[in-house]
Amino acid sequence: MATKILALLALLALLVSATNAFIIPQCSLAPSASIPQFLPPVTSMGFEHPAVQAYRLQLALAASALQQPIAQLQQQSLAHLTLQTIATQQQQQQFLPSLSHLAVVNPVTYLQQQLLASNPLALANVAAYQQQQQLQQFMPVLSQLAMVNPAVYLQLLSSSPLAVGNAPTYLQQQLLQQIVPALTQLAVANPAAYLQQLLPFNQLAVSNSAAYLQQRQQLLNPLAVANPLVATFLQQQQQLLPYNQFSLMNPALQQPIVGGAIF
C-alpha cells in the first residue's frame, strides 16, 4: 500500500508541474533590431508621467543646490585674496619713500627692513624681531660654547638679569670678557695688529675711533696697573690712531686675523 501511495503522489506531482510549465517559443528569439521599435512610445509616455517629471525636477534642484555653495566659496576666497593683496600694496606704498632713503644710506638695514613684511613676528613686535636677528648672529658661538662647556652655557642664559632683559648685549659682553686675555697678549706683542683686529668688528670703532680708544682704555686700566707693558700699549694707541683710520678705508692694509682659533 505504501508503495502505491508514493507512486500516486509522484504522478500527481508530475501532472502539476506539467500544467504549470510553459515553453518559450522560438519566435521570441527575434533580432534585437526589432525591439527598439516599441521603446520610443513607452519612453515618451514615461517621461510625461507627473511622478517622473517631479523626480527629474527634484534631481535638478539638488544638483544646483550642491553646486551653488562651491561657487560661493570660490568667490569668497578670491575676494579675500584680492583684499589682502590691496592691503599689502597700500602698506608698501606708505613705506616706499623712507625705504628708498634708507636703501641709499644703509643698504644692509634696508634689506633687513624688506624682510619685516614677510615675518609675522616682525609685524607683531619689531623689537622682538630685531632681537631675534641679533641672537642669530651669536648662535654659532653659543653652539660651540654649549658643546665645550654646557654648564657655562646654561649659566650665561639663566643667571644674569641682563641676559633676560637684553640677551644680545649680555652675550657680547661675555664674549669680550672671554677674549680679553688673548687680546691683551696680542696688544703687548703687536699693538698695530691688535688695533687692526678690533676696529673692523666694532661698530663704535668704525663710527668714532676716539671714543672707541677711550672705551678700551677704561677696560684695560686695571691691567695697566698690574702690568706696565699695558700702560705703554695704551699710549701707543693714541699714536696709531691715524693709521687705524686709514686702514679702515683701505681693506688691503688690514692684516688677517691672528689667533683665529681663539675667536
UniProtKB/Swiss-Prot annotation:
Keywords: Repeat, Seed storage protein, Signal, Storage protein
GO MF terms, alphabetically ordered: nutrient reservoir activity
The protein's name in its UniProt record: 22 kDa alpha-zein 16
Tissue distribution: Expressed in developing endosperm.
Described function: Zeins are major seed storage proteins.
Gene expressing this chain: AZS22-16
Superkingdom as given in the UniProt entry: Eukaryota
Keyword match Transit peptide: no
Miscellaneous note of the record: The alpha zeins of 19 kDa and 22 kDa account for 70% of the total zein fraction. They are encoded by a large multigene family. Structurally, 22K and 19K zeins are composed of nine adjacent, topologically antiparallel helices clustered within a distorted cylinder.
InterPro entries: Seed_Storage_Prolamin, Zein
Signal peptide bounds: 1-21
Pfam families in alphabetical order: Zein
Organism: Zea mays
Family assignment from sequence similarity: Belongs to the zein family.
